Design a protein with these regions (language model features):
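A conserved beta-strand-loop-helix scaffold within acyl/acetyltransferase catalytic domains
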Residues: 157-203
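Conserved beta-strand-loop-alpha-helix junction that forms the acyl-donor binding cleft
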Residues: 85-91, 234-249, 261-265
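Short amphipathic alpha-helix that is part of the acyltransferase structural core
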Residues: 1-20, 120-156
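Acyl-donor-binding surface of acyltransferase catalytic domains
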Residues: 48-50, 55-127, 262
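Residue-level recognition of the GNAT/N-acetyltransferase active site
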Residues: 57, 206, 210, 238
Length: 265
């Protein structure tokens, strides 16, 4: 197994460009662990607290599933707290093998990958407006990122780490607030460009301001901005959040793929 990726790996990921969009993006940056055969298995871990990404083609044999399991346990073992983003057919094998190994596992998150070929303006009005964050907003953006991760109970990190991420987003004009009519920051989201797509993420509305269509209008406007740049808008959602997914579908998002995160129980 090689410790580097090249064009062969990026071409493989084109077959799952929606579900493995994040993997194709993070492979271009610093990674703590990379293993690939450039044909049927790519493993990548960036850093804690993020999950390990495991790409495999569809229709794996049992031997191929076991090979992926063994590689994951050699490099980023579940017993040490690592989580994995992977396809469902591989997740089933991992959960069974984890049980046999004495480290029971579960599906922690079911994820949908959507794209938006034609954004649709929301039918219901919302007060306020979109705000592109600048350097002056870094501290508040960091707080919003912190609240987002706490709300979804995934990839939690301290406020200093959130500030680093906020600064990085803002330097690339990639972080937005929705401000209500009183000028309060009530929601946020980010976006990243990569390989002809623009991924919307960190969509969060503060609890006391929900059910007022803020997120729908915010995501629509950012989605339209991405489309206007000639990119294909896409996003990941928690499959179990039916209300949020319905909101995205109303503004033109179409389900393109599914994957999951598994972790020790």
């Amino acid at each position: 197994m090689d410790h580097f990726v090249d064009e062969r790996d990026l071409q493989l990921l084109q077959n799952d460009r929606y579900t493995f969009y994040v993997l194709s993006r993070v492979l271009g940056g610093p990674c703590a662990v990379i293993r690939t055969d450039h044909e049927s298995l790519i493993l990548c871990h960036t850093e804690h607290p993020y999950p390990v990404w495991l790409w495999t083609p569809d229709g794996l044999t049992e031997a191929e599933k076991e090979r992926a399991w063994q590689l994951a346990q050699e490099t980023c073992p579940m017993a040490r707290g690592y989580r994995y983003n992977l396809k469902y057919e591989l997740a089933e094998h991992f959960i069974a093998r984890a049980q046999e190994s004495g480290v029971p596992a579960r599906i922690a998150t079911n994820m949908f990958a959507y794209d938006c070929p034609a954004p649709i303006a929301p039918e219901t009005a919302a007060e306020g407006s979109l705000h592109l964050c600048t350097e002056a907003d870094i501290d508040e953006a960091a707080q919003m990122i912190y609240e987002f991760h706490e709300a979804v109970a995934a990839d939690q990190q301290d406020i200093d780490r959130c500030r680093i991420h906020a600064r990085r987003h803002i330097e690339h004009q990639g972080f937005f607030f929705w401000k209500n009519a009183d000028g309060e920051t009530v929601a946020c989201c980010s976006w990243h460009p990569n390989a002809g797509m623009g991924s919307v993420g960190s969509v969060y509305t503060r609890p006391q301001h929900r059910r007022r269509h803020y997120a729908q209008h915010m995501v629509y406007q950012v989605t339209q901005m991405i489309a206007d740049k000639g990119l294909t808008p896409m996003l990941y959602t928690d499959a179990d959040y039916a209300a949020s997914n319905a909101c995205y579908e109303k503004i033109g998002y179409v389900l393109q793929g599914k994957l999951c995160t598994i972790s020790a129980k």
